[in-house]
UniProtKB/Swiss-Prot annotation:
Organism expressing this protein natively: Aspergillus terreus (strain NIH 2624 / FGSC A1156)
Role summary: Xylitol dehydrogenase which catalyzes the conversion of xylitol to D-xylulose. Xylose is a major component of hemicelluloses such as xylan. Most fungi utilize D-xylose via three enzymatic reactions, xylose reductase (XR), xylitol dehydrogenase (XDH), and xylulokinase, to form xylulose 5-phosphate, which enters pentose phosphate pathway.
InterPro entries registered for this protein in UniProt: ADH-like_C, ADH-like_N, ADH_Zn_CS, GroES-like_sf, NAD(P)-bd_dom_sf, PKS_ER, SDH-like
Presence of the UniProt keyword Transferase in the record: no
Record-listed NAD(+) binding positions: 177-182
Source species taxonomy: Eukaryota, Fungi, Dikarya, Ascomycota, Pezizomycotina
Protein name: Probable D-xylulose reductase A
Family: Belongs to the zinc-containing alcohol dehydrogenase family.
UniProt pathway: Carbohydrate degradation; L-arabinose degradation via L-arabinitol; D-xylulose 5-phosphate from L-arabinose (fungal route): step 4/5
MF GO annotations: D-xylulose reductase activity; L-iditol 2-dehydrogenase (NAD+) activity; zinc ion binding
Annotated cofactor note: Binds 1 zinc ion per subunit.
E.C. code: 1.1.1.9
One record GO biological process: D-xylose metabolic process
Alphabetical keyword list: Carbohydrate metabolism, Metal-binding, NAD, Oxidoreductase, Xylose metabolism, Zinc
Length: 353
């Protein structure tokens, strides 16, 4: 597949094609051009491919997919000082305005004018070349491969979730959903010093993976009331009056309910997974236990940097999550396999410059 800037473009629901797009130009002296080498497939990419929208974000025009990427710098702007041609980088795919109140408060993930890759109307990173500001590219140390570099994005999500939960050494943490983000939440919680980390899922293979990866225990919920599952979860894992922290990385309503009920009084609940836009919520339990209930969205200041440091130091292993790598021209087949639930994290190889 030879082209100037071959890109994997979503045309409509289940309609994708390879298209040669213009090579991006350096419009900012602080910008860089990256030759994208590896891109992970995220659930949001698959959702756009399957449904053409996620909530208010609707694909109206052809859009390049992908946002979990790593690559090699091929061009730098005149004012770039931290990177040079040939540097290997993890690519943070959301560029904030830097001017609005959330940005100025240090919460740029909540930017009112966020330009996020593969979120309409912005093109994603499944292309030969992609342009970014230099400060949204994180130089990879020698011990981190480009394949691992592509997982800094979901790891950044997990870092943000665990930071929202303010996990501290010795705490007990229950993580609902043993997909890539849930598994990485287990790993980050462990790196932060949590003593008990219980992974919860309804799929046995994922639970077994979690047990061998970063969870200290696993739990398969039964088809019973949330309070009953929570009581059994607490008893089987010796959580005393309840867990200190519950993280939902599934977006499933039964998990949300069980997560609230599994917590001790004054515990912390963080919603990291996105499910239906509206669902029932056990508000009485949240109030009477005076829980700290928080949302978590993407990643913010310092999250990507910490993600790289956690992998570089050996405290988090992302290599184990990579269960498949496909060629760029096989991208659509990879989407089908991810939709079918095969593997943990599939990467698409880029086109080397």
């Amino acid at each position: 597949m030879s082209a100037q800037n071959l890109s994997f473009v979503l045309q409509g629901i289940h309609q994708v094609k390879f298209e040669d797009r213009p090579i991006p130009e350096l419009k900012d002296p602080h910008g860089v051009i990256v030759n994208v080498r590896f891109t992970g497939i995220c659930g949001s990419d698959v959702h756009y491919w399957e449904h053409g929208s996620i909530g208010q974000f609707v694909v109206k025009d052809p859009m390049v997919l992908g946002h979990e990427s790593s690559g090699v710098i091929t061009k730098v702007g005149s004012a770039v000082t931290t990177l040079k041609v040939g540097d290997r980088v993890a690519m943070e795919p959301g560029i904030p305005c830097r001017r609005c109140e959330p940005c100025k408060a240090g919460k740029y993930n909540l930017c009112y004018e966020m330009a996020f890759a593969a979120t309409p109307p912005y093109d994603g990173t499944l292309a030969k070349y992609y342009a970014l500001p230099e400060d949204f590219c994180y130089k990879l140390p020698e011990q981190i491969t480009l394949q691992e570099g592509a997982l800094m994005e979901p790891l950044g999500v997990a870092v943000h979730i665990v930071r929202q939960a303010a996990v501290t050494p010795g705490q007990s943490v229950v993580v609902f959903g043993a997909g890539p983000v849930g598994l990485l939440c287990c790993a980050v919680a462990r790196a932060f010093g949590a003593s008990k980390i219980v992974a919860v899922d309804i799929q046995k293979p994922r639970l077994e993976f979690a047990k061998n990866y970063a969870a200290t225990a696993i739990f398969e919920p039964a088809k019973v009331a949330a309070q009953e599952n929570a009581a059994r979860l607490i008893a089987e894992n010796d959580l005393g009056p309840g867990a200190d922290v519950a993280i939902d990385a599934s977006g499933a309503e039964p998990s949300v309910h069980t997560g609230i009920h599994v917590l001790r009084t004054g515990g912390t609940y963080v919603q990291g997974g996105m499910g239906r836009s509206e669902m029932n919520f056990p508000i009485m339990a949240a109030c009477t236990k005076e829980l700290n209930v928080k949302g978590s969205f993407r990643y913010g200041s310092g999250d990507y940097k910490l993600a790289v440091e956690l992998v570089a130091s050996g405290r988090v292993n992302v290599k184990e999550l990579i269960t498949g790598v496909v060629k760029f021209e096989e991208a659509e087949q990879a989407f089908k396999e991810v939709k079918a639930g095969k593997g943990i994290k599939t990467l698409i190889s880029g086109i080397e410059a």
